[in-house]
């Protein structure tokens, strides 16, 4: 099953996350199918590729709870 999940990047104490489509059995830092956004919690900043996210959701990708909250704040129907 494909999931929309956060993949951590950045320095210590300054995390940056990429929102990726990845197989649910792969580890968090594993190889992703597609990168569809960036989330920086320190500044509460998000950058999303909305058409790609909608396409993945239509094809059955399931967002994790955190990604679901990010999408709801961006007013993307989940």
Curated annotation (Swiss-Prot):
Family: Belongs to the bacterial ribosomal protein bS16 family.
Entry keywords, A to Z: Chloroplast, Plastid, Ribonucleoprotein, Ribosomal protein
One GO biological process term: mitochondrial translation
Domain of life: Eukaryota
NCBIfam families: S16 (TIGR00002)
InterPro entries for this protein: Ribosomal_bS16, Ribosomal_bS16_CS, Ribosomal_bS16_dom_sf
GO function terms (MF aspect): structural constituent of ribosome
Organism: Chara vulgaris
Cell location: Plastid, Chloroplast
One GO CC annotation: small ribosomal subunit
Protein name: Small ribosomal subunit protein bS16c
Claim: Magnesium is one of the keywords in the record: no
Pfam families recorded: Ribosomal_S16 (PF00886)
């Amino acid at each position: 099953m494909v999931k929309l999940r956060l993949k951590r990047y950045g320095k210590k104490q300054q995390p940056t996350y990429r929102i990726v489509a990845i197989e649910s059995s792969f580890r968090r830092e594993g190889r992703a199918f597609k990168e569809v956004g960036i989330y920086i919690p320190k500044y509460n900043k998000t950058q999303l590729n909305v058409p790609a996210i909608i396409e993945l959701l239509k094809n059955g990708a399931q967002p994790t709870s955190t990604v679901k909250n990010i999408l709801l704040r961006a007013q993307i129907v989940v």
